[in-house]
């Protein structure tokens, strides 16, 4: 099978979150499974400098974007054992300091940028000598591709590919003023309301268009697939998703264990495994030293790596830490986002010197060191489509403390569910009090050496490799092709 993945970000070229990790790993997993896979993504600032092997393709296209015609160039990168990467080059849209925003402000032309990207994806799928049988779109930035392909099928594209849309986070839908629809050059009937077009309360909703027009819809965990059809977590699209539930599948993301590996990892201070755990204590001591916390094996170290957004449960985490930092624990945080939440963490660090270390931004090396050096990892999300950090934590023997929602509930086993297979701590109510109770439970686990060893070994044996995940995606592709 020939599969083209389209995503606004792909690791290691561009990344703001788990979307990039998933798409890069899925491309590799498809190649390893014997499929022909390629990925298309924008050429953002700095990629050419970091990857000098990029090659310009003798391919130029001029695409209609409303009343104007916009040019694009194409670059490619081939790497052994990996999906080929195609890069859409338009400096006016993609040569910027950020991918979606600068200084916490979204780019005003994001609708135009990613409508253009979607048109480039369709052009690539139709006219490259390598013709995909399936085009797999990721999130709102590529979600108009199924509608654009259907438009060209109506105009005579006889061997058009089937389409699959993966929703990584339903909260991000790509909603723009009605005038943005003109940029798509789609017929007026594609803007139809009532669940049969791209219209959403008088606005263009890119993700809704993908849900309506894609041949198949997947999301990144079985529980999240159920949750998004409810009014509580459907983000206003639950009705449309219920109408299209027959083509909706939940597939838990896999983990790239070549990247997230405790036995061979350049970022770790010392490697270790579930059979030889001594290296974990070394990583804890070196992490404490690195972030400026007192080096003390007896103090449980809690960590988090997260976008600072309400979805991630930052509000209840700050509330719980206010209480729990009065006990004998340490906390390290990495991430960026809401200025209000950044301020909250700075104030926490000022009030609890020697107990709290905060760093803003993203640092790949530090993220591995936090996963390896912490005893517990906090993920108190309000909702979580899949989540990857809890799976990274499990592989690193760092016990995840999670709210039982979405993929967190699918991947973590609490002691009360199955003592023999317990690998984490769950709580259910979205409150600071419930999270604080889970932290106290974790401290009690830490105080019993045999119990913490059991949790760590069970956690490290959990298997979320891509083998099962990619098989489920291939089944979806085969189903829509048949």
Question: Predicted regions span which residues?
Answer:
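Catalytic cores of nucleotide-sugar-dependent glycosyltransferases that transfer UDP/GDP/TDP-activated
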Residues: 1-482
